[in-house]
C-alpha cells in the first residue's frame, strides 16, 4: 500500500468522456464500506460490466453536490479554444438526478492503483544530494520526450511550468488557469493523510505546453530580426522562476524552505537553450557548471514572496486541492538580496544619459540585462555561446569569486589619477581593431577589442588629454554591432573601472553573513558605475597566465582579470618592458584588398541569411572570425553528407558552397592582415587551383582583383610601416643595451617580403643578421645550428622552431607576423623573455564604409587603376573628357592619328577612337553630328573599317554639356539612331567578327565614367594576366618610322603595331613571318587581324634591303612595242564588290584621268616598284559628286550611280592604290547586308545592283567550303571571283627571252597539288585571250561567265590572267549573276604581286557569255588557239589551259 490521496487516484482516471451523469442507471450489488448495497450502474455500453474493487482507502461515504465553476469567465480568450471540452447543459443533471448518481465509492471503484516510486530518488535509486542539484544541466539537443520521461526531482516545487509570455504580467491570475472546467464538490470531508506538495507535483506531473511555446518563440525570433519589441517599464520586468528553470535545464535546484526568488540578471541567460524545433539552434548548446553553493535568485525577497503567495492562491482554483491545503501564514523575511533597480535606489546610483526608448530593440541592454547565461553574483563568468560561433565582440567583464576582505582592500586603493582603459577579454577580431589615432574610441567603435597581449606605445602621450569625459552608455549600446540575432546581449561601459591590485581567484564560503553579501553587492555596483570618471582613450591589456583552465576550455579566448589601476602609461611601459603588441596601420594595398574581399563577401553573407543559416544573420565580414566560419563550414558539410546518403540534395549544396566561399575569404583576410598581400595572393592562387571545379570562377575573379591591387602597389610604392617600426625598435634596443640578440619570428611564405625585410635589416649599422633555414632532411632547426651563429639578429620561420630551440640565448623576441592566440606569446612569458609583436589594424574609414563592386566593371571605382590607352586626334576637341579621365580615373592617353580608311568617312574631329586593348575600341561620337545628312552612313562605314582591327566596339553618343541630364534628340537624330540600330541588329545577328554596343551618355562626366567601366570590364573579362594587360611601360609616345609602316595596314591599330615592334625581332622578320609564327608571338592579338596582315604580306616579295625601308613589290616590266595593255594581276573590283566580297582581298587601282573618245584606254607602260605604304588604303578618298570624272560614253554616263555615298576622285599623276583585306573568319559579312548599295563607281544599273545584293550570302557561304592542299603555310581561303588572289603565290616576273611570265622561288610559294610545274606559262601579251575560242572551252568548267556587254558593259582595261588556275571542278559554284558584280581595273603601267590560281576550263554552255569579255575598245591581238594539258600529279584527270 502506498500513501496516496483520493485526488491523485481520481485525476489519474478522470476524463471528460467518462462523466458519470451520461450513463443510465441499473441496479447491481457492490461492496461499499464493508457492506453490500445495490448500486445503479451506468447504462453506457462502454462502461465496465464487472464489479470493480473498491478502494481500500475509502472509509466513508460522501455527499456530492456538484457546482460548475468556470475558469473561462475570466479568460474569454480560452472559450473558443476549448469548446470541445464543455459538457452540454442537457447532460448536467446535478440536482434532479443526484439521487440516482453513483456515489464517490462507486466512482473510486473504477480506479486502478499504480505504484509510484519515491520522488526523492534519482534514476539510480539514490537520494539526491545538493551537489547533484547544482550540477544538473541538460542539453538542448535532448528531445521533449526525454524530458517528459525523465524523473527529475527538485527541492523546489514548480506548480506552474506552463509557458509564460513576457508580455503577460504575473499579477494576472488568469494566466495560470487551466483551460477546462472543474466540477467542484462543495463539501468534501477527507479523512486521509494530506500528501506532500512534492508528491502532488510528481503525481500531477504538469507539463508545459511546449508546442505553443516553440511556436511563439519562433515568431518572436522572426520579429526580433526586424523590429524587436520593447516592454512598457523596465521596473515591471519579472520572470517566473519556473520559466527560467524550464528555459535552461528544466530542473534547477532550489530549497523548499525558501521561496523562489527572481532577480534581474546581471549576467547573460541562455534564451537560446530552449526546446525549439529549429535544428540550427541545437548548435548553440554549451554546458556550464553551476556553483555548488550559489542559489539562483532572480527576484528580491519581497517580490519572490508575492509571487510565491500568488501561486498558492492560483493553485486554489484547482478545486480538488482546496480541502487538502493548509493556510500558510505569510512571514516577512529579511532581504538577503536586492535587484539592481533596488540597489540603485538604495545607494542613489544613477547612470548618466540612460534614456530608455520603449521602441528600442535593445531595451534589455539599457536595463542592465544580458540574457546569455544564468549565474549569480558570486560566480559571474560570461562566455561566448553557440559553440564558439558568437559574433559578439563586445568587451566582456570577467568577475571571479573573490573573498570579501580582498575586495575591500581593493576598494580602499581606488585610483584618482587618469586611469587606463582595460580590456579583459581577447577580441574575436582583434586584428580588425582601429588605430590609436581614433579621437573617441568608445564613441566611434564601441565593439573594439584588443587581445590580452596588446600594448600600445604609439600616440600615448598625445591621447592622454581627456576627450569626451563622460560618454553615455546608451550611445554605446545603440552603436553596438554584430550581436547574434538569437542572443540577448548587454554591452557594458566601454571603459571599466580599474583596480590597483590583481584580483586573485578564490571561492566564496557558503556561510557568509547577510551584511557581507550586501556590502559585496554594493561594492560591485559602485565598481560598475565608475566608468564616469574614466577619460583616457589609451587601451592596455595584460593577460594573466594563471587563468582558470576550466573556464578557458569553455571560452573562445583567454580571460584575464582587471589589472593596472593607478599607474601612468610610462610606468606601465617600464614595468612591462617590451612585452606588448604594437598596432601597425595597414598599408594602402592591404586596405584596398580588404575592401575588395569585403565587397565579394557581402552578397555571400546575404545569400547565407536567405538560405536560413541562422548564425550568419548578424555576421559582418570585418568582425567574423576564422573559427566561426570554419564551424559553419563543417556543419554544412555534415548536412550535405547526410543529404547525399538520403538522396535529397536541394539547396543544401548551395549553402555549403557559400559557406566554403565565406570561409576562404575570411582566411584570405586573416593572411592579408597577418602577413602581406603577396602571401594572401599565393594562398588564393593555390585555393583557386584546388577548388577550381567548384569555386573556380568566383575565386578567379577575386584573384584578378587582388592581382590588380598588387600591380597598383608596384606602380606606386607604399611605405611599409611594420618594417619601419621594427627598425626603430631595434635601434632603440641597441642604444639602450650594449649587447643584444634579437629573434625575429616570421610566418610569411612570400619571398619578396622576406627579402625586403632582410634588406632593411642589413642596412642597420652594428647589426649582424642571420637567416636560419631548416635542413631538408629535418623539419626543425637544431639547437647547435642556432647557437653556432654569432650574429645579433636571427630571422627564423615559425615552422622551423622545434622543442629544443635555445630560447634562453635571446634577449628579445619579435613576432613579425602576429596572430591571435599566438603560442609564442605564452611561451615567452613563461620563460620571462621580453616579447613584442606587430599587429596590423585597419583604419576606421575602411571599416565604416560599405563597399560594393561596380555591377558593370566588376571592380571598385574608388581604386584608381593606371590605364594607358591610345586615342585619335579628335580627343583634343574634348578637353573636358580628357581632364576627367586623367584626374578622376588616372587614365593616360597617347595620341595617334586615325587610319586612312577612317578618314574616308567624314572628318575625324567630330569623333574619337580610343583603343582599350588589342580587341576593344571605343568610339566617342558627338550627338550633334547626327543632325547632318548621311551621318548614320558614316558611322556604319567607320564601324566597317574598324571591324578589321577590333572585335568589340563601343559607341558612346554623348553631349558636350557637363551637367546635362537630358538628351537633345531632334527628329534627324532619332532618324539616324533608328538607322544605326537597324544596322547594328544585322551585325549582331549575322556576325561573329565585330560585337557592337551603343550607349547614350547624358554628359561628359557620364562619358568618362563609362570609359572607366568599359576598361574595368575589359580587364576583368580578359583571359590574360592582369599584370601583362596593364603593363604598358614598353609603349612609345612618339611614333617611330617602323610603326608608321605598320599603321599603313588597314588591319593594324596603334596598340598592335607597337606590340609587334616590341615583341618581334625586327620589322623585316614581322613582314616575312607566317601566320603560325605571328600567332605564337602575339597570342593576345585577334586572329583575324593576323590573317589579314599575312594575306597582305604574302603578296609581296620582300628583299633583304627592305629592312629599314617599306616593303617593295616586284612588278613586271612592260614593253610598249610588244604590250599595249597589261591586265592587273590582282583582279581588283569596284568598292561595291569590295563591300560584298568582304572576305576577299582586292586591290583597287586608280583610274586614268581621261577616257578616250574612241573608247580605248591608253595605258602607261612605265612600270615602277610600288611601296607598301602607297597601297595602304583599302578605299578611295571621299569626294563630292561633282568631282567625278564622267565617262564620255553614254552607256557609262547612264550607269553611274546617283545614290552612292561617295565617288572616286580620279587622279592622273598620283593614283591611289587601295587594298582591301581578307576577312576569312567571318561566317557572314558584318557590313554586307546593310552596305551593299555603297560603291565607288557604279557601272551597273540599279536592278543589277539589287542582283548583287542577293549574291552576297552565296559568296560568303561558298568560301567556307573551299580548302587548299598545301605543303607550305595556308594563309588565305579560296575566293569565288575569277581574278581574286588565291593562296600566297610569289610574284611573277616577265621573261623577255621566252616572252612568258615566270614564277620565282619564294618562301611563300604555295602548291596546289602533289606536284606543280616550276614555270607557269601565261598567255602571250600579243594574244587575245577570249576571242573566238568558244570551241576550246571544256564541259567540265562551269559557273564562270562574264556578262556580255553590248551597250552596258564598259571595259576600260583588259584584265590579263597569268597562271590562270581558275577553279577546280568542285569549286565552280559561281554563276553569271555573281560575276555581274565584279569589275576589273588596272593601273596603267603598274601591277601588283601575282597569285596562282587553279586552272579550269570554261563550260561550253557559257560560250556566248564570253564574247563580250574582251573590250571592243582595246587593240585586237593575234588570235591564238587554246590548248589543254593534264595537271601534273592529279589522278582524277583534271586539265588546264596550256600556254604557248
From Swiss-Prot:
Gene Ontology biological process: reciprocal meiotic recombination; resolution of meiotic recombination intermediates; synaptonemal complex assembly
Statement: the UniProt record of this protein carries the keyword Amino-acid biosynthesis: no
UniProt subcellular location: Chromosome
Residue ranges of the TM segments: none
The UniProt record lists the keyword Hydrolase: yes
Alphabetized InterPro entries for the sequence: SHOC1
Keyword line: Chromosome, Disease variant, DNA-binding, Hydrolase, Meiosis
EC number: 3.6.-.-
GO cellular component: chromosome; condensed nuclear chromosome
Region: Disordered, residue numbers: 1106-1129
Disorder: Spermatogenic failure 75: An autosomal recessive disorder characterized by male infertility due to non-obstructive azoospermia resulting from maturation arrest at the spermatocyte stage.
Role this protein plays: ATPase required during meiosis for the formation of crossover recombination intermediates. Binds DNA: preferentially binds to single-stranded DNA and DNA branched structures. Does not show nuclease activity in vitro, but shows ATPase activity, which is stimulated by the presence of single-stranded DNA. Plays a key role in homologous recombination and crossing-over in meiotic prophase I in male and female germ cells. Required for proper synaptonemal complex assembly and homologous chromosome pairing. Requiref for recruitment TEX11 and MSH4 to recombination intermediates.
Similarity-based family: Belongs to the XPF family. Highly divergent.
Binding partners and assembly: Interacts with TEX11. Interacts with SPO16.
Protein name: Protein shortage in chiasmata 1 ortholog
Species, as recorded: Homo sapiens (Human)
Underlying gene: SHOC1
